[in-house]
C-alpha cells in the first residue's frame, strides 16, 4: 500500500520543543472500521496512546476519514510514525494527500 509518511510533509516544523498540529486525510475508500482496527492493533501492541500526543480527533468530512492531532514535539511524532506506518499498511489505510503539519502558536482551552 502506498502511504505517505508524516516525515515527508512540510519541512518547516523542526526541533524537539515545537508543538505541532498534524492533519491527515485518508483516501476516500478508507472506512471507520479500518480506523478502529488500526487503533485496536496499536493498543494491543502497547503503542496507544503514544507519548507526546496531546489530542487526537478522528472524523468524517467531505466523504473522507480525517484525523487531526496535537503533538508535544516533532521528534515524538516521528518516533510514533515508525510504529504506526506498518500498521496502516497492513490494515490498508492510504492517505489522500501528504499530511499537513503546522507549528502551533497558541492553544486556548476552556
Label each residue range with its predicted role.
Residues 1-66, 72-86, 93-110:
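Short S/T/G/P-rich N-terminal loop/turn motif that feeds into the first structured element of a domain
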Amino acid at each position: 500500500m502506498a502511504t505517505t509518511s508524516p516525515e515527508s510533509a512540510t519541512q518547516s516544523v523542526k526541533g524537539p520543543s515545537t508543538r505541532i498540529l498534524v492533519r491527515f486525510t485518508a483516501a476516500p475508500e478508507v472506512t471507520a472500521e479500518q480506523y478502529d482496527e488500526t487503533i485496536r492493533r496499536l493498543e494491543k501492541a502497547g503503542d496507544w496512546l503514544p507519548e507526546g500526543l496531546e489530542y487526537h480527533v478522528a472524523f468524517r468530512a467531505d466523504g473522507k476519514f480525517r484525523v487531526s492531532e496535537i503533538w508535544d514535539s516533532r521528534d515524538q511524532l516521528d518516533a510514533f510514525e515508525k510504529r504506526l506506518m506498518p500498521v496502516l499498511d497492513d490494515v490498508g489505510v492510504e492517505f489522500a494527500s501528504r499530511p499537513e503539519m503546522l507549528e502551533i502558536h497558541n492553544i486556548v482551552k476552556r
